[in-house]
């Protein structure tokens, strides 16, 4: 059965060890300060062989989108210098290295794919045209598993396995 949990670390701490086959955490860890603690809890909660699905901002994709779509080289330079990204709806997003965040945990990256490889670079003028979404989806799906495309995407989707 599917169970959606919305809450805090306290709620996670109240759950039994190895009680989940799959945990989804999409576009969350950029907005919390204690991501290492959260990842440790996810590891505890996953059954051996369980999967953790993480979607996160990709710093390379953020810089590309800022230069190409927003036409704001100074903001892109600030991002390159380590400044956090102010998002439209979620607030301050802090970049992080997923490999470093899980290096001492019983989690291993199995695979990753790019999300919004080209979408985030397109002018909004085109996005309302008939057939645009279908064509863009076809293009995104054609490259989402392939480097270098997945490495420049705005978001990346990681699949990690609990050992």
Predicted feature locations:
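A C-terminal cap/extension of S-adenosyl-L-methionine-dependent methyltransferases
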Residues: 111-163
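Short alpha-helix
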Residues: 88-106, 112
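Conserved class I S-adenosyl-L-methionine
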Residues: 51-79
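A short acidic, Gly/Pro-enriched loop at the edge of an enzyme's catalytic core
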Residues: 13-23
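Conserved SAM-binding strand-loop segment of SAM-dependent methyltransferases
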Residues: 1-14
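A short glycine-rich, Lys/Arg-flanked "PGG" loop and its adjoining helix->strand segment in the class I
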Residues: 36-51
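General small-molecule cofactor/ligand-binding pocket signal
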Residues: 3-5, 110-113
């Amino acid at each position: 059965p599917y169970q959606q949990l919305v809450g805090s670390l306290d709620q996670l701490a109240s759950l039994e060890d190895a009680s989940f086959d799959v945990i989804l955490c999409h576009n969350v860890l950029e907005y919390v300060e204690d991501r290492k603690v959260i990842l440790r809890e996810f590891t505890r909660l996953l059954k051996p062989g369980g999967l953790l699905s993480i979607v996160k901002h990709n710093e390379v994709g953020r810089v590309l989108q800022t230069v190409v779509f927003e036409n704001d080289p100074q903001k892109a330079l600030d991002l390159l210098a380590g400044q956090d990204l102010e998002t439209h709806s979620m607030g301050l997003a802090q970049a992080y290295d997923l490999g470093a965040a899980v290096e001492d945990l019983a989690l291993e990256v199995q695979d990753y794919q790019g999300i919004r490889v080209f979408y985030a670079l397109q002018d909004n003028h085109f996005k309302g045209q008939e057939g645009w979404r279908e064509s863009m989806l076809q293009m995104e799906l054609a490259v989402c598993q392939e480097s270098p495309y997945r490495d420049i995407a705005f978001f990346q989707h990681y699949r990690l396995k609990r050992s």
